[in-house]
Amino acid sequence: MKISYNWLKEYIECDLAPEAVAEALTSIGLEVDSLEQIEEIPGGLAGVIVAEVVECVDHPDSDHLHITKLNTGEAELLQVVCGAPNVAAGQKVLLATVGTVLGEDFKIKKSKIRGVESFGMICAEDELGIGESHDGIMVLDPEAVVGTPAKDYLGLATDALIEIGLTANRVDAASHIGVARDLYAYLKHNDIPCKLNIPDVSAFAEGEGEAIPVEVLAADGAPRYTGTTIKGVKVAASPEWLQKKLLAIGLRPINNVVDITNFVLHEIGQPLHAFDLAKIAGGKVVVRRAEEGEKFVTLDGVERTLSSADLMIANTEKPMCLAGVFGGEESGVTESTTDIFLESAYFNPVSIRKSSKRHTLKTDASFRYERGADPLVVEYAAKRAALLIQEIAGGQIVGKVQEFYPEKIEKKVVELDYNHIENFVGKKIGHDVIEGILENLAYEFIEKAETGAKVAVPSYMVDVYRECDIVEEILRIYGYNNIELPQAMRMSVNAPQKPEPEQVRKAVSDFLAANGFVETMNNSLTKSDYYAKLKTFPEEKCVRIMNPLSSDLNVMRQTLLLNGLEVIAYNINRQITNIKTFEYGSVYSFDPEKDGKTLDSYEEHTCYALFISGQPEKSWRTDPGKGNYFQLKGYLELLLKRFGCDIYSLETEAAPADIFSEGLAYNLPGSHQPLAVMGTIAPARLKQFGIKQPVFAAEINWPALLELVKRNKIRYKELPKFPEVRRDLAILLDESVSYADLRKSAFRVGKKLLKQVGLFDVYRGDKIAEGKKQYALSFVLQDLDKTLTDNDVEKVMSKLLSTFQNEFGATLR
């Protein structure tokens, strides 16, 4: 936003230079992006001075040139050759000395004109840029003082353009008076002499006769609307002072009436609009919503299609203005206008913002309205503009000001606690200082007490609602630089959760990604039909959506497994048959035994799900084989071991048959808390999703995995110095005996020397009786203190075989 320094000084009397003003504004939150010096004439006529023609004679080699000698206030006279017909001795003139630059690039140089040296140029009006006459040189008042710079003699104005990077919440400062108010509060707080001057509108008086009536049909869009009828105006060019003000901030003067509305906008911050009274059909102004598809031609000549949400200023026949955004081509003020209707209103910010965005129109008016204009300045702005119109364009106010204002808009009231404010600020700044700053910012004190106060917020402070907002106001005037840094830091220290869930999650995801799994993300909403025939996840435990978008998204998922099968089916249907995916996400359930009105009726927790299906592409190096049950089991157990889990210490049971045709469920020992479930997806579930190839899946209970990590204590031990010994054993067993039982017994017997037990072959078939199976087991033994002898190894192996025979009926093969 652009602010003219000279214009600003009309509202605040102070002795601050433009640079000091810019620094002050930045310190109070109105950050100055740039400060540019502006001169009425580029260059400020530097090098041009008042001189006296002491002698003037004709040039001996010309019929029109003159040789003059001028007094410039120096000891010696200056010789200048001049061709002006009106130059004469005794005149006071403006002399451009050698080195002066006139206009953009005309530099005065020492020259020789027809053999006579010339040391400057006596100037005409057009050469100086202060007029258009070139009939002769400018002849000054005889009282002009020789040596006076032309800038001072002519009274050329200099100005400074202050460019403020206005934030969206500071629409109160989107005007010269708005900036002056803030600057006044700053200067008063710092005891710098200043005075705030707000233009007086007490001379405004309503006239006789009938004013144009106003009807508001869209009160939600225009909570306050006023119209002033002025007749007998003379539309012409604006006076020089008004044009200069607008030009200083980059606005193009149009005519006196339009220029006044723009002037008041940038003076007060209230947008105004003037209509040609003769173009208001039916003699009535109507504020209404547009009809859907209605056509309207704006001031830029573009025909726009309106929406029923657009707020319009219309007559009885058609729209005249897109309210708060842009005027219409047909209703604007022109040179033939004699009577006008002056609008000043407060429009709904949301309505204006949507219309501005819908029609891609950004104007000075919409900029202010969509951020929240001041509803209480509407009347003042109308009076200010009407008085200026009468002063500059003539005319008389007709009838009463027409106003629609059904519900009075009150100022916001905020209660303050001084101790709370000082704690928030971090410094005891004093109650009198707080009150002084707020009074300088025009806050009204409704109640005062020793501990606090109740204040009415100025209507133009649209972003102030709460005590913390007022603290910000106090701080920016008091000065952030005046708040000393504390010598001690007071803070609460929260011990980080151990283990940190995000770190564990990252480790799990990195592990899976490193092993070829691709992460997927699915919608938490799914269809209830998936759960219709499940016992593990019954449909009645689904959390139902009250207003579902469709029947496919009517419940929250109870498990990640079904969503994962959707992904697999989707990929298989697109010829991607080799699949390894995982997902991390939340699952939800409802307790049907509770009423559902309280949070304890619902449960949410997170899970990991893993899926393997299909066969990887063959390589010249190896045949990877098909994805299978044991491949998935290996990944799952490797993952659990990664976080310190002893797989064989977990409690296991069969996986639920309605989800898996075969599989295992792992529970934490002691607590029976479910940790993971894995297996081959049941054919019924595959059919449900149209999948015709085997799918192997696992689901990990995330809270249980975190509990497992929490239990895990890292222990360090010295690397073994003595060699390992491996022995193999083939035994015949009943089908009912599991490898886990054998392993547990083996470690119980050989716990001192036995380090590893492995199953490397399972055989069923020829020469093996029905109901029997053969296990080939490997055993790794090691003593940390010495090298094992054959005798040591044989003793352990004998004990193992004896245990297997006695406990499981094993037979050595």
Model region roles, listed by residue range:
Residues 49-79, 147, 243, 255, ...:
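Conserved mixed alpha/beta core segments that line enzyme active sites in large multi-domain catalysts
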Residues 114-129, 133-139, 150-160, 164, ...:
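Mobile "lid/hinge" segments at catalytic clefts and subdomain interfaces of large enzymes
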Residues 414-582, 727, 780-784, 792-813:
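Extended, well-folded interaction surfaces typified by the phenylalanyl-tRNA synthetase beta subunit core
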Residues 5, 23, 28, 40, ...:
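Glycine/proline-enriched, intrinsically flexible loops and inter-domain linkers
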Residues 40-44, 203-205, 264, 492-493, ...:
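Beta-rich nucleic-acid/ligand-interaction surfaces
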Residues 1-205, 341, 364, 372-375, ...:
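Phosphate-backbone binding interfaces of nucleic-acid-interacting proteins
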Residues 2, 19, 439-446, 467, ...:
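A carboxyl-terminal module marker
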Residues 183, 187-217, 393-421, 427-428, ...:
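Terminal amphipathic helices with adjacent charged low-complexity linkers/tails
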